[in-house]
Amino acid sequence: MHIGKHIADVIPHTVNGITELRDVMPTLLDLCESPVPETVDGCSLKKCIFQEASFIRSYLHGEHSFHSQLSNHYIVTEQDKFIWYSETGVEQYFDLVHDPRETHNAIADTDKQKRIAKLRRILIEELQDREEGYSDGTRLICQKPVDLLSNVHDY
């Protein structure tokens, strides 16, 4: 994220950490000294911009919903990424330290099974209370996504 000098006179620097587009809005609101709604998933990076703190997120849960076999959920850390395709059940695992371009799906690699199980458990917990029924708290459950979530009527 580039912050212009008219917003903050800071020395350009890189912040290492797991960030995503969802962090832009809360950062901009925070820079404007406006409240960040509690319903926002992202985190403000303002303290990182002013070098007051480092940004630490142990993992990020993301999703892509295409209403096709490509719909997926993922857990990404600084070291690796676990992907689960919610309509097919296909899983992928990438060791981002040794394979930063994600060319080798290591889901079947014996030496990675313990780590894969840990990331799968995190995803199971992230999806547990979702109305789509992707997880019952003990496993991932494949199914077609619902066409309309119940909260759409809240807007």
Question: What label would you give each PLM region?
Answer:
Residues 1-3, 19:
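Short glycine- and hydrophobic/aromatic-rich loop-to-beta-strand nucleating segment
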Residues 13-16, 35, 107-108:
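Short, solvent-exposed loop/turn segments at secondary-structure boundaries
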Residues 15-22, 39, 113:
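Short, solvent-exposed loop/helix junctions and linker helices
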Residues 110-136:
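A contiguous, mid-protein "functional segment" used to position or interact
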Residues 7-10, 22-25, 30-92, 96, ...:
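C-terminal cap/loop subdomain of S1 sulfatases and analogous C-terminal strand-loop tails that border
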Residues 101, 106-112:
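Active-site-proximal N-terminal segment of extracellular/periplasmic enzymes that hydrolyze or transfer
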